[in-house]
Amino acid sequence: IMDEKISHPYERRYITLTNYLARYNLDAAYRIMLMAHWDTREFADQDLNPENRFLPILGANDGASGVSVLLTLAEILHTLPPLNIGVDLLFVDGEDMGKTGDPEKFGLGTQAFAKNVPEPRPQFAICIDMVADQEQHFPIEQFSLQQAPEVVHSIWLLANDLGFPQFENRMGNAVMDDHYYLYKYAKIPAIDIIDF
C-alpha cells in the first residue's frame, strides 16, 4: 500500500491517494507490470443529461473493469506463480480527477508512483482501462505505439493469433491514461488497452 497526500486539483483541501502494488516472483530481474485505476470520476461531466453532470459516476466500466481483470490475474498468479518472470499488479488512485483541457490533473496516482518505482523495475507495463463494454473495440492507442511499439505489436499479434477480433489493427485515439504518465515520469514503456 502506497499513500500519497496531495492538494486536491481543484479544491482547497488535501486528499490522500492510495495505490496498491502486488508483486509476484520478487527475485526475478525481468518484470512486467499490469495496471488499472480503481477510482471513479467525482462528477459525470460528460453525461448527456446536464442535470447529472455534478453527480459521481458508478464506474462499472471506467474504473471497475480494469480492476476486475487484475483481480482475476491475482487469483491465477497465486495458484500458478510465474517462474521465469516477475509480475507486478498496480492498482492506482486518482486517475480520473482531471478536467478536459487540464491533462496534468489526470493520472495523479501514477504520477506519485512514478516518483518512487520500487526495484527491480518492470521492463514494460500494460494499462487496462474501460474493457467491459458489450461491444469491445481495442484499436491501437497512439501514445502506446510511440512509447512501446514492440509491446503493442506483440500483444495485438498474439490477440489476433488467439482469435480476439476486438484487438483491431488500426490507429485509435491518443488517450492520456495512466500509461502515458508512467512513461512520462518513470520512463517505463507502457501501453493502454482501452475501448475509448
Q: What are these model-predicted stretches?
A:
Residues F54-E150, A174, D178-H179:
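Acidic/histidine-rich catalytic neighborhood of metal-dependent amide-processing enzymes
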Residues Y24, E42, A74-P81, F91-D93, ...:
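Sec/Tat-exported extracytoplasmic proteins
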Residues R13-T16, N25-A28, P81-N84, P118-P120, ...:
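Extracellular/periplasmic catalytic domains that process cell-envelope and extracellular macromolecules
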Residues I1-D27:
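A non-catalytic alpha/beta surface segment that caps or lines the substrate-entry region
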Residues D45-P56:
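Glycine/charged-rich beta-loop-alpha catalytic/anionic-binding loops adjacent to active sites
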Residues L21-R23, R31-M35, G59, D88-F91, ...:
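Structural recognition of the beta-strand scaffold that forms the well-ordered cores
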Residues D3, S7, F124, D133-F196:
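Active-site-adjacent substrate-binding region
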Residues I6-P9, L26-A28, W38-E42, G94-G98, ...:
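Solvent-exposed loop/turn segments at secondary-structure junctions
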